[in-house]
């Protein structure tokens, strides 16, 4: 956690961040599973109040500053979506073990629905990684994969899953 060893719930309040309700699974799985001192989340989408924050593939914005009209998502919009998906992952952890049980973020895997030629996946998934740093300080530093894919469920631009270490 942070240098002051503040409880995670206190740090969230300091930052003005409220964890959302756990998103309902869209298929046959559970949001999170605990094995020993690790919690694995299922892939989380950027749902806000039951609605996807954005939809479509991520592509660079044109020189005129506009995305094309084919359901495109800008890298900046996708970065925001990754942050929301990360919050949803934390909500799944909170629902299973309580957010104050989290010792550290171990691994983040981020999937980015990418238009042909888009290779900015690391920058998109930074939306999740930076959130974990804000909340957990050094304990938010983690191993990570940022993977470009052709399609994601429900036409979401990003999906984030995490592995966290919790108190035994």
Q: Where does each model-flagged region fall?
A:
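Short, polar/acidic, helix-capping and beta-turn segments at strand->helix junctions
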Residues: 2-168
């Amino acid at each position: 956690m942070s240098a002051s060893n503040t409880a995670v719930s206190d740090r969230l309040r300091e930052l003005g961040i409220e964890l959302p309700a756990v998103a309902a699974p869209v298929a046959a799985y559970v949001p999170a599973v605990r094995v020993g001192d690790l919690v694995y989340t299922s892939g989380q989408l950027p749902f806000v109040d039951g609605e996807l924050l954005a939809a479509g593939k991520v592509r660079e914005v044109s020189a005129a500053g506009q995305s094309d009209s084919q359901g495109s998502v800008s890298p900046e919009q996708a970065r925001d979506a990754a942050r929301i998906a990360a919050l949803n992952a934390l909500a799944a952890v909170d629902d299973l073990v309580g957010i104050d049980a989290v010792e550290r973020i171990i691994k983040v895997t981020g999937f980015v629905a990418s238009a042909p030629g888009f290779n900015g996946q690391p920058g998109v998934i930074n939306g999740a990684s930076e959130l974990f740093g804000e909340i957990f300080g050094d304990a938010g530093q983690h191993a990570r994969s940022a993977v470009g894919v052709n399609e994601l469920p429900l036409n979401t631009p990003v999906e984030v899953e995490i592995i966290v270490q919790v108190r035994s």
